[in-house]
């Protein structure tokens, strides 16, 4: 135990002596090492009073940037086995204890003052500072707890593996080796390993390789460096390479080439045999011949060898620039930043420019073909035709009936002939003239209508005293309306074919005027497809189309307001009224004067004639009550309410077009000479006038025109009775007042007008021919007190030849029979009563 302690004390003393020598060197030679600045926050660092100089505090010495070495000086100097831990304080080293620190720790203890117990005792010894175990012979393990099993060797202190002594092999070194002196035994396998220069199984053959080793099994020479040949007797001449061991060819090192590897790689190449190319080194600088490294790279490249392009979206020096966006999402060039690829039809740094100058495709590398009246598509090169043409080269005009882009739209013209570009309809010469004439006509008509409105508005502002004037002075507005209607009939006819004209509607109402005048233009060409229309059809007051009749009737309010005034005026004239003399005009005369207005009136359609006669009579009866009473003085109408407003006709027998055709029209159109065998005057168009074509003349103009006295045609008187009008007779009876007669006729007119829109089939024409006989009989009975000449005229039937020319006259004959029946019954009623 003591021997062991003395052996352990020697190394400790030597370690302490080395520590003291180090401290002495640091003390004596402080200037050998450059002093390091102290850290103001380091351990034991103080400032000199009165200055900012940093220094170690008292009792401490600098170590690095702080003061970590304690100084024990003077009487406090530490002994050999002591360590200064604080200024003037010493402690025993690890492994020693005692008052003077001169006693070594026992084997089972270690550490400061020998306070730590050793865990590897008693098969080992702990190190004084760390406590690590050092096992005794034949022991191994972390705490020396395992016994060594090697028979002819030692155990590894950590793993326990056997280390066999020479001549022994195996896991526990229990097998002996049988090798010659020129070999050694393998401790794992027991095989003999020949020494250098010997070969064979027993290593008893010497190598003949010129001092070079040979293979142990075959004896083949393994030449040393820079030697080659079968016996390694030839010298290698490769400067920067290795020789082949058999033929001596050189295998050059990286960066050299040539037969003897004496030529360095040219610029831009590196590697074995200079077969690899350098990357994009900046300025054509050579790369390292061995590894191919570049100092700096060209713009757009990076990597140690400058062989990698910039990442997507970056370009330029060091790949530090971000690419601007390219059209259609393409990436830019990693060197220049420009777009690398553009879609077909686009070029430019950002693919923002279309192909021009007749080019198309990728990079605008293709030339467009001739596209005629079109242009080339900058992407595909296909011809895009302008409106009106088509075809692969845009040189074919659109066929008839088509227009627009690629001739894909159909023309809307009736003749299917339109402009191939715009689709506008072509107008022929006569059509253009028709449109121009229609425009001029509309302008003229608008001017006339405005004049009429101004006149009517001026008449409305008259004071109440003007209303009390005689009925003769009130005829001016009525005459003006009739004149305007006749002027419109005289306007020329303009063929418009299928062209449409705007519709003009002007309505006028004048409280002073007892007529309510309305003017409507005819339906459009599509609604009424007639080749032409006249002003008569346009502004006739007796239109009976599907859009409704256009007429002039006494206004109800105006009639009611003026009824008292007219009744008073009528009473003053009744006393002087008697049978009309030969020289005065009669209702038959009025009917004869009406058709003689103009040729243009006779050329109007046969639909408006009969109805126009009735409307004209209604207007005259309202405007001239005194004269009407004078003419109707011979009749005595029943004062019963049902006679004032007769019931409407039976819808089953009502004609489709008008309820006042036939004999009334014939009588209105008949001139003053005897009607037998007489024909109507021809119209300007060359057509013969029929009773249905008779026109109506405004009452104002008819009254002003004087004419010779003529007997009233009996058919006209019969028709007047059929319509509810009073006619002069020889028998004097109480005359009906003009307002009452006008009200009755207006009510009957409204009832008849409402039934015009109903589309019933008219009765057969054969039944209408027999309607004359009852009317003639009733007319003879009711006119028994008339003069002899008037009775003869009433009993004589009117000629039927003109009425047979137009089929439209036949339905009204039945209506005339029904209308004539009611007045006849009304005429007999007073006699019966």
From Swiss-Prot:
Biased composition (Basic and acidic residues): 619-630, 748-761
Basic residues bias spans: 804-816
Region (Disordered): 578-833
Keyword Plastid: no
Glycosylation sites: 75, 302, 357, 395
A GO term, aspect molecular function: scavenger receptor activity
Domain of life: Eukaryota
Transmembrane segments annotated in the record for this chain: 434-454
Topology, Extracellular side: 34-433
Cytoplasmic face residues: 455-833
Residues in the signal sequence: 1-33
Residues recorded with modification Phosphotyrosine: 615
Disulfide bonding pattern of the chain: 67-78, 72-90, 92-101, 118-126, 120-133, 135-144, 148-155, 150-162, 164-173, 177-185, 179-192, 194-203, 207-214, 209-221, 223-232, 236-243, 238-250, 252-261, 368-376, 371-383, 385-394
Single GO BP term: heterophilic cell-cell adhesion via plasma membrane cell adhesion molecules
Residues annotated as domain EGF-like: 63-102, 114-145, 140-174, 175-204, 205-233, 228-262, 364-395
Record-linked InterPro entries: EGF-like_dom (IPR000742), Growth_fac_rcpt_cys_sf (IPR009030), LE_dom (IPR002049), MEGF10/SREC1/2-like (IPR042635)
GO CC entries: membrane
Name of the protein described by the UniProt record: Scavenger receptor class F member 2
Underlying gene: Scarf2
